[in-house]
A protein has these predicted regions:
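A short, exposed loop/beta-hairpin motif centered on an aromatic-Gly-Thr core
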Residues: 13-25
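A short, charged, amphipathic alpha-helix used as a generic interaction element across diverse proteins
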Residues: 22-43
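Short acidic, gly/pro-rich beta-turn/loop elements at beta-sheet edges
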Residues: 16, 29, 54-56
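Short aromatic-glycine-(Arg/Gly/Cys) micro-motifs in beta-strand/loop hairpins
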Residues: 1-15
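Short, mixed-charge low-complexity intrinsically disordered segments
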Residues: 36-58
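A structural detector for beta-sheet-dominated domains
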Residues: 9, 20-22, 47
Length: 58
C-alpha cells in the first residue's frame, strides 16, 4: 500500500488528510463521491507521497 495526501478544498478552507491505498483509482472514486455528497467541496488534490505524482479531482 502507498501513502497519499488528500487536500480537500472548501472555499478558502483546506483540510489535509493522509491516507493509504493501492493506487489513484480508488481514491479518485472516493473523491468524486465526497464532492457529490458535500456541495461545499470545490477541489480535491491527491498527491502520491513517494513519487510526488499529483491528480486533481473537481
Amino acid at each position: 500500500m502507498r501513502r497519499f495526501e488528500l487536500k480537500i478544498q472548501r472555499g478558502r478552507e483546506v483540510e489535509t488528510r493522509i491516507m493509504r491505498a493501492n493506487g489513484f483509482g480508488s481514491l479518485e472514486g472516493m473523491a468524486q463521491d465526497m464532492i457529490s455528497d458535500d456541495y461545499k467541496i470545490t477541489k480535491i488534490t491527491i498527491t502520491n507521497l513517494a513519487t510526488d505524482e499529483v491528480k486533481v479531482v473537481r
